[in-house]
Amino acid sequence: WLNALLHHGLNCAKGVLA
């Protein structure tokens, strides 16, 4: 689940930065 959580966090950060 850690990988999924990390991916979700990265996607979230990407959306925020965008």
From Swiss-Prot:
Pfam (any one): Antimicrobial13
UniProt signal peptide: none
InterPro entries in the record: Antimicrobial13 (IPR012516)
Major localization listed first in the record, in broad terms: secreted
Top-rank taxon: Eukaryota
Compartments, as annotated in UniProt: Secreted
BP GO annotations: defense response to bacterium
Annotated positions of the Alanine amide modification: A18
Keyword set, alphabetical order: Amidation, Antibiotic, Antimicrobial, Disulfide bond, Secreted
Any single Gene Ontology cellular-component annotation: extracellular region
Subunit organization: Heterodimer with subunit B; disulfide-linked.
Biological role: Antimicrobial activity against S.aureus and P.aeruginosa, possibly by attacking the bacterial cell membrane.
Protein name: Halocidin subunit A
Organism classification: Eukaryota, Metazoa, Chordata, Tunicata, Ascidiacea
